[in-house]
Amino acid sequence: MSQQMHNPSIRRKLVIVGDGACGKTCLLIVFAKGKFPQVYVPTVFDNYVADVEVDGRRVELALWDTAGQEDYDRLRPLSYPDSNVVLICYSIDLPDSLENVMEKWISEVLYFCQGVPIILVGCKADLRNDPQVIEQLRQQGQQPVSQAQAQEVADQIGAVEYIECSAKTGFGVREVFEAATRASLMGKQGKSKAKSDKKKKKKCVVL
C-alpha cells in the first residue's frame, strides 16, 4: 500500500490532430522514439505510449496519432473518446494549416471532446526563417506564420497554451508533451475553477 502511494500509476490519453503533413507524426515519433523519420508516410491510425514526469509525478501518456486528410474524416472520431488533452497542430510554413485550425479542427474537437484541455502547437519552427520557404510563400502572397498570429488563434479557440517546436531539430518537443501532461492532470480542476457553470465531466463524449 505504501509503495502504491509513493508511486501511483497515472494514465492519461493525448490525441493529436491537424492538417495532413503538418508535422504531427514526426513530433510524436521524435518524442516517443528519439529519431526523426526521413520519409513522409500519411498516418492512418497509430498509437504510442510514453512515460512523462512532471512536477514529481510519473504519468503514462498514451499518444494517439490521427490522419488529417479528408479521406479519414469518418475514421478520426474513433480516436477521441476518453481523451484527457488534445493537441491541435499546424505547420508554421503553411499559413493555410493555421487557418484550418479555425475553420475545421476546433469545431471537430469541441464537438467530440467538450471540456477537454486544448494546446495549440506550431510545428516546423525551423522553417520560419528558411529562405526557400520564405520565397515560395512570397510568390503566393503569403509568409510564414508569426508567433503573434498563432497566439491570437490560440486565444480565440480557448487553448490553455500555445507552444512552438521543431521535430527536426528537437526544439520544444519535450516542452510540448510536458505542457500537455500538466494540462491533462489539471484539466478538470482548472476548467471548473474558470467556469463553474460547466459540467464537471471533462472526458470526451461521442455524440
From Swiss-Prot:
Topological type in the membrane: Lipid-anchor
Region (Disordered): 187-207
Membrane is among the record's keywords: yes
Domain of life according to the entry: Eukaryota
Cellular compartment(s): Cell membrane
InterPro entries xrefs: P-loop_NTPase, Small_GTP-bd, Small_GTPase, Small_GTPase_Rho
SMART domains noted in UniProt: RAB, RAS, RHO
The entry's keywords: Cell membrane, GTP-binding, Lipoprotein, Membrane, Methylation, Nucleotide-binding, Prenylation
Residues that coordinate or bind GTP: 18-25, 65-69, 123-126
Modification Cysteine methyl ester, positions: C204
Propiece span(s): 205-207
Motif (Effector region): 40-48
Single GO MF annotation: GTPase activity
Keyword Transferase among record annotations: no
Biased composition (Basic residues): 190-207
A single BP term in Gene Ontology: signal transduction
Entry GO terms, CC: cytosol; plasma membrane
A Pfam family of this chain: Ras
Lipidation (S-geranylgeranyl cysteine): C204
Function: Involved in the regulation of actin polarization. Rho proteins are required for distinct steps during polarized hyphal growth of A.gossypii.
Family: Belongs to the small GTPase superfamily. Rho family.
Protein name according to UniProt: GTP-binding protein RHO1
Provenance organism: Eremothecium gossypii (strain ATCC 10895 / CBS 109.51 / FGSC 9923 / NRRL Y-1056) (Yeast)
